[in-house]
């Protein structure tokens, strides 16, 4: 089976590495890829938001299956075009991908499915913003306002703040750009990311993970696409894990089928484990980055066969997933000034070591690997427990040099110290 992976991040590097371990995968192709994926897959530079370009490439390389990594091609309907061309595709169609592409749509689906989430309100006019802010945040008894871009924002469209001026400025900027604003009540409790492979109403959960969205230590600073993650979660009871699948993911999958928007792909639910139980923070329509890097490091089942089963309506027959013992930790190395406009073009030293997954990298004509994006690399450490996996990840990271690069030193630290409980 020849597999074409769409995307250019560390998530796609992790997918390619896992697919390469599947004995039924005979060839790997990636578009557009990066300096790291070029070492393990045939690489093509195409516009991945163009359905025509992706279909043409899949035909050209003789792909038996296409796996779409990022959310933008999915929301634009690229998976629909691939399937219409008669090629197996892992990734939801445009209608189902609205679960991530529109937070208002996701809220409507959750309400119909009886799934607990934050109270919310859509604001589509600057004239209504101030009155809406009065109904949320501290005026409503919450510790902070939660102000979100209703559309895709690469993980950086959310502001959580106790400062009304900051909340208002973010909402006003979104509205000025023509984006509706979603105001939400504050959900308190540790967060969980759970990936589920979904084939209409069949749901196969992967290991739960936790990611770190803020750029700074102790969850300070601006939101990012993610600065690190670990899996599994030693503090998450099995009964809560099962409850998330049976009372959240399965009802949402069934509701999408009922609406004629059946989901086939990776459904990612972001949760807060509150005092009243799990509540949904967000749904995404694809593998998350950086959680994927940690979760797939522990997968023993053949990934290509798993994704192909889901994409061809045979997921119910796949069987129970197998996992390695232990824990995996991902730490992201970011470029100077990320999540603002990142500095690029710096030489990265030590990036070809085992456990290093590339994201914002390119290879110059002289062979040097240079930074080309905000999140430059992910390093993945594994170990018998969280402390050992953390030590392994930071040991790998210590041998990498990137001028101006920065990372968080506290990925998984509170959990390793036993400071998270539910």
From Swiss-Prot:
It catalyses: 5-phospho-beta-D-ribosylamine + glycine + ATP = N(1)-(5-phospho-beta-D-ribosyl)glycinamide + ADP + phosphate + H(+). SMART domains: GARS_A, GARS_C. Residues 107-312 form the ATP-grasp domain. ATP binds at residues 137-193. This is Phosphoribosylamine--glycine ligase. Binds 1 Mg(2+) or Mn(2+) ion per subunit. Signal peptide: none annotated. Its EC number is 6.3.4.13. Keywords: ATP-binding, Ligase, Magnesium, Manganese, Metal-binding, Nucleotide-binding, Purine biosynthesis. The keyword Nucleotide-binding applies. Mg(2+) binds at residues 282, 284. PANTHER family: PHOSPHORIBOSYLAMINE--GLYCINE LIGASE, PHOSPHORIBOSYLAMINE--GLYCINE LIGASE, CHLOROPLASTIC. Belongs to the GARS family. It comes from Mycobacterium bovis (strain ATCC BAA-935 / AF2122/97). GO terms for biological process: 'de novo' IMP biosynthetic process; purine nucleobase biosynthetic process.
């Amino acid at each position: 089976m020849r597999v074409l992976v769409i995307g250019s991040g560390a998530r796609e590097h992790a997918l390619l590495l896992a697919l390469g371990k599947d004995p039924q995968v005979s060839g790997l192709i990636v578009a557009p890829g990066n300096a790291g994926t070029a070492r393990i897959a045939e690489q093509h530079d195409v516009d991945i938001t163009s359905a025509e370009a992706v279909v043409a490439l899949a035909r050209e390389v003789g792909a038996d299956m296409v796996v779409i990594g990022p959310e933008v091609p999915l929301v634009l309907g690229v998976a629909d075009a691939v399937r219409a061309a008669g090629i197996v595709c892992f990734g939801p169609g445009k209608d189902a991908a609205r679960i991530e592409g529109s937070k208002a749509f996701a809220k409507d689906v959750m309400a119909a499915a009886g799934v607990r989430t934050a109270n919310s309100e859509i604001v589509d006019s600057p004239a209504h913003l101030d009155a809406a802010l009065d109904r949320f945040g501290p005026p409503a008894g919450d510790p902070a306002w939660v102000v979100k871009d209703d559309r895709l924002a690469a993980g950086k469209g959310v502001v959580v703040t106790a400062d009304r001026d900051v909340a208002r400025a973010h909402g006003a900027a979104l509205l000025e750009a023509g984006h509706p604003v979603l105001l939400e009540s504050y959900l308190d409790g540790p967060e969980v990311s759970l990936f589920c492979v979904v084939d209409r109403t069949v749901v196969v959960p992967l290991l739960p993970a936790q990611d770190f969205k803020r750029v700074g230590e102790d969850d300070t600073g601006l939101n990012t696409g993610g600065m690190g993650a670990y899996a599994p979660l030693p503090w998450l009871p099995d009964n809560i894990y099962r409850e998330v699948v049976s009372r959240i993911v399965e009802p949402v999958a069934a509701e999408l089928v009922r609406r004629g928007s059946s989901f086939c792909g990776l459904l990612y639910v972001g949760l807060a484990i509150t005092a009243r139980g799990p509540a949904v923070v967000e749904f995404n329509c694809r593998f998350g980055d950086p959680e994927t890097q940690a979760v797939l490091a522990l997968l023993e089942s053949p990934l290509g066969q798993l994704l192909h089963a889901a994409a061809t309506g045979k997921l119910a027959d796949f069987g129970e997933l197998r996992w390695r013992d232990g824990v995996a930790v991902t730490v992201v190395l970011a470029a100077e000034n990320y999540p603002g406009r990142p500095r690029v073009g710096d030489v990265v030293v030590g990036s070809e070591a085992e456990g290093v997954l590339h994201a914002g990298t390119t290879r110059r004509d002289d062979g040097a690997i240079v930074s080309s994006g905000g999140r430059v690399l992910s390093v993945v450490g594994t170990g018998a427990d969280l402390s050992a996996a953390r030590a392994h990840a930071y040991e790998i990271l210590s041998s990498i040099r990137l001028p101006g690069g920065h990372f968080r030193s506290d990925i998984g630290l509170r959990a390793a110290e036993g400071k998270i409980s539910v």
